[in-house]
């Protein structure tokens, strides 16, 4: 095996797997360096994929021929479409995942991937030559060369585990932290900080009184993650639901000093939307109970993940408070929970390609950028790996705007605003969420992926067939119409306004369904469920989509105003020192990106625009 590649990916978690695959799919000779082959694709925390906002990211990864959706469908054991009762724009596909099935399927995919080598070593340092990255060095001094390197270290950069008074240097339980890489990033001058996340105890399902619990079943009709998945063959399971009690809260409150944060042993900021049970007891002191989902980790695994009680108190206290919950009175613990602190790089150090501004050729993806979650990591990994491959080939980078993808929203948030706490995706972060639905991710992105070279032949063929079907259905829906008289004669209540109405206009009327319209136009009954769903959504959102497209046009006018990469903000008049510092730090590429930087006022934008126009006219 050669010691020279086009792209090196460091880290075999969710970001690293997607980065390595995307780079290889795009035609770059790729090397994935990871400390253990057997932990590639490991789900280190909760055994689930998707959710609100997160499910959108999984669908977008899939639309670009990434792995998470397809692999998830080989391991999904409890599918649920969240927000089903609400509009399609905010629905989120989610599934419990069999950890073992997921890991095995991911490894089978990567270990046989064209253009991809996987080597199990611990990287200790980067090779930097003439101010650019040139490869990586392992703990024994072996050299691996590449002009592009993607760093996906997760929680391993100077990771420290906290469990009561116990403090262990580790990237996760059983794995050593990455000290050398963290030291190298500090030495290069990267602006870095400290974050924290946590995980709950793992319970022995054989010791849970399941018959005393409320149970939550999977959806009768599973909604797959991948557009390529036609059916789910994995057996579906139920999850249990229990609750914390007043006694639970009393035990935690009395022993709060054992917590890493409340005991003063950890300074990293934890995720706001996934608080520890200690945080819940303190922040929501008026609540006497919190819901806890008991999620089996696999079909042939008795391990249960108690979602909602991540903690860093001692093992003794964990067992005490767990046994105060209904159904867990006699529970035994397989592995106790813990908090983990780790270093991250301020994502304002990055371009929208996820390449670092400070060290050309180095890309960062995943928790190293201050995000939390498998889906956020996977989406960043895909974009970093793809852009690294495109850069090696001398091609234009892949950057999605906020109106094109949730991936674009996330990366723009990160590189423009930075983070002060672990970032997670929500539908509320997207201004154009009626357009950015989970159901149309392939319609938005697969053609882009084909042009970028990251979409393979199987997906290309499937997408071509689906695209042709949608075009034919939409053409038919626009081509046939009813006059008000015709509509009323066939049983539809329509105003006599002289307006002919096509299929979409008819569907927008109360109590009109495609099944009813099929009695008028029988061809509708031949449409596939996918086509029927898309037409129904487009009809329901028609007026709103038109208004949102107007908003997109206004957004793009600002995005089209490019700012010079070498702009000297010291020469721009009427800017405060604070605004100058923020602009110089982020180095926005467009006026729109500048507008999204905290503290940049409309007056500052006007001054900036005037300066750029004068410079162009000079």
Curated annotation (Swiss-Prot):
Needed co-factor(s): FAD
Classification via InterPro entries: FAD/NAD-bd_sf, GIDA_C_N, MnmG, MnmG-rel, MnmG-rel_CS, MnmG_C, MnmG_C_subdom, MnmG_C_subdom_sf
Signal peptide residue numbers: none
UniProt GO BP: tRNA methylation; tRNA wobble uridine modification
Pfam family of the protein (one): GIDA
Chief location bin: cytoplasm
Binding site for NAD(+): 270-284
Gene3D superfamilies: FAD/NAD(P)-binding domain (3.50.50.60), GidA associated domain, C-terminal subdomain (1.10.150.570), tRNA uridine 5-carboxymethylaminomethyl modification enzyme MnmG/GidA (1.10.10.1800)
Annotated residues for binding of FAD: 11-16, 123, 178, 367
Annotated Gene Ontology cellular component terms: cytosol
UniProt-annotated location(s): Cytoplasm
Quaternary assembly: Homodimer. Heterotetramer of two MnmE and two MnmG subunits.
Physiological role: NAD-binding protein involved in the addition of a carboxymethylaminomethyl (cmnm) group at the wobble position (U34) of certain tRNAs, forming tRNA-cmnm(5)s(2)U34.
Protein name per its UniProtKB record: tRNA uridine 5-carboxymethylaminomethyl modification enzyme MnmG
Organism in which the protein naturally occurs: Caulobacter sp. (strain K31)
Gene name in the database record: mnmG
């Amino acid at each position: 095996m050669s010691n020279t590649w086009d792209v090196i990916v460091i880290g075999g978690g969710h970001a690293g797997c997607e980065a390595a695959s995307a780079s290889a799919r795009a035609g770059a000779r790729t090397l994935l360096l990871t400390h253990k082959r057997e932990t590639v694709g490991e789900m280190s925390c909760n055994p689930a994929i998707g959710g609100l906002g997160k499910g959108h990211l999984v669908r977008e990864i899939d639309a670009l021929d990434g792995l998470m959706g397809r692999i998830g469908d080989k391991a999904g054991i409890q599918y649920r479409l969240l927000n089903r009762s609400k509009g399609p724009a905010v629905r989120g596909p989610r599934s419990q995942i069999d950890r073992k099935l997921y890991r095995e399927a991911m490894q089978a995919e990567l270990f046989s991937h064209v253009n991809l080598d996987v080597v199990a070593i611990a990287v200790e340092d980067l090779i930097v030559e003439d101010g650019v990255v040139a490869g990586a060095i392992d703990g024994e001094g072996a050299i691996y060369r590449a002009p592009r390197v993607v760093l996906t270290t997760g929680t391993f950069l100077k990771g420290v585990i906290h469990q009561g008074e116990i403090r262990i240097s580790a990237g996760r339980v059983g794995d050593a932290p990455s000290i050398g890489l963290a030291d190298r990033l500090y030495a290069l001058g990267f602006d870095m900080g400290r974050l924290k996340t946590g995980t709950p105890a793992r319970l022995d399902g054989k010791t849970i009184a399941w018959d005393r619990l409320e149970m939550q079943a999977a959806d009768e009709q599973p909604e797959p993650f991948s557009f390529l998945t036609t059916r789910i063959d994995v057996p579906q399971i139920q999850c249990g639901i229990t609750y914390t009690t007043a006694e639970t809260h009393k035990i935690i409150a009395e022993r709060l000093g054992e917590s890493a944060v409340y005991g003063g042993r950890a300074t990293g900021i934890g995720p706001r939307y996934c608080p520890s049970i200690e945080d819940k007891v303190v922040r929501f002191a008026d609540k006497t109970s919190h819901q806890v989902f008991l999620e089996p980790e696999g079909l042939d695994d008795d391990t249960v993940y108690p979602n909602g009680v991540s903690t860093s108190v001692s093992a003794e206290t964990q067992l005490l408070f767990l046994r105060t919950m209904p159904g867990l009175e006699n529970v035994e613990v397989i592995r106790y929970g813990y908090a983990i602190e780790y270093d991250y790089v301020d994502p304002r150090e990055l371009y929208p390609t996820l390449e670092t501004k400070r060290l050309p050729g180095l890309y960062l993806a995943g928790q190293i950028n201050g995000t939390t979650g498998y889906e956020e990591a996977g989406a960043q990994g895909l974009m970093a790996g793809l852009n690294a491959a495109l850069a090696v080939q001398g091609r234009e980078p892949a950057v999605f705007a906020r109106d094109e993808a949730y991936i674009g929203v996330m990366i723009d948030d990160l590189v423009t605003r930075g983070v002060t706490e672990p970032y997670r995706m929500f539908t509320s972060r997207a201004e154009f969420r009626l357009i950015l639905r989970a159901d149309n991710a392939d319609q938005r992105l697969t053609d882009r992926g084909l042009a970028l070279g990251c979409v393979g032949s199987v997906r290309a063929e499937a997408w071509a067939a689906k695209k042709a079907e949608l075009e034919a259905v939409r053409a038919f829906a626009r081509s046939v119409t009813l006059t008000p008289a015709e509509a009323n004669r066939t049983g539809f209540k329509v105003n006599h306004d002289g307006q002919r109405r096509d299929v979409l206009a008819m569907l927008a009327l109360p109590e009109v369904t495609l099944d009813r319209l099929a009695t008028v136009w029988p061809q509708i009954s031949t449409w596939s469920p996918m086509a029927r769903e898309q037409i129904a959504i487009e009809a329901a959102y028609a007026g709103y989509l038109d208004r949102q497209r107007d908003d997109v046009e206004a957004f793009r006018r600002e995005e089209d105003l490019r700012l010079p990469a070498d702009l000297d903000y010291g020469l721009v008049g009427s800017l405060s020192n604070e605004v100058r510092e923020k602009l110089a730090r982020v180095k926005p590429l467009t006026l729109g990106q500048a507008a999204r930087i905290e503290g940049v006022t409309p007056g500052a934008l006007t001054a900036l625009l005037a300066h750029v126009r004068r410079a162009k006219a000079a």
